[in-house]
Swiss-Prot record:
Nitric oxide-sensitive repressor of genes involved in protecting the cell against nitrosative stress. May require iron for activity. Represses hmp expression under conditions of elevated intracellular iron concentrations, in the absence of nitric oxide. Pfam families: Rrf2. GO terms for biological process: negative regulation of DNA-templated transcription; regulation of DNA-templated transcription. One of its GO terms (molecular function) is double-stranded DNA binding. This is HTH-type transcriptional repressor NsrR. [2Fe-2S] cluster binds at C91, C96, C102. SUPFAM superfamilies: Winged helix' DNA-binding domain.
């Protein structure tokens, strides 16, 4: 399964925030510079992550963005469920005449559930803690 760029950059933004020293805020501009993604795209991503509680946005002079909860409580499977449209096929009888007898949708659904179940085994902390090579690449040492 290939994730959309929206989900990919959402995960990357969370990884960046989780790599920062505890409590340090960052900005959307800083995250976009690190990953080379458009600011408008990142604003949409951060807004959705914020609505889901994964990110906290603070307005004002000393504002910015940071994780909305501890990295060890943010399950990667939950983030993907929030950001990723998980419908793999468009099963509608008006588009496909085999829909009433087709078993493909069920098979793909089981595959997606297995994929998400595996991602549920990882937290954001699992991806960033004690990862010195990551810190060097993100320049957050």
């Amino acid at each position: 399964m290939q994730l959309t760029s929206f989900t990919d950059y959402g995960l990357r933004a969370l990884i960046y925030m989780a790599s920062l020293p505890d409590g340090r805020m960052t900005s959307i501009s800083e995250v976009t510079e690190v990953y080379g993604v458009s600011r408008n795209h990142m604003v949409k991503i951060i807004n959705q992550l914020s609505r889901a509680g994964f990110v906290t946005a603070v307005r004002g002079k000393n504002g910015g963005i940071r994780l909305g909860k501890p990295a060890n409580t943010i399950c990667i499977g939950d983030v993907v469920r929030e950001l990723e449209p998980l419908s793999l096929v468009n099963c509608s009888s008006e588009f496909c005449h085999i829909t009433p007898a087709c078993r493909l949708k069920q098979a793909l659904s089981k595959a997606v559930q297995s994929f998400l179940k595996e991602l549920d085994n990882y937290t954001l902390a699992d991806l960033v803690e004690e990862n010195q090579p990551l810190y060097k690449l993100l320049l957050v040492e």
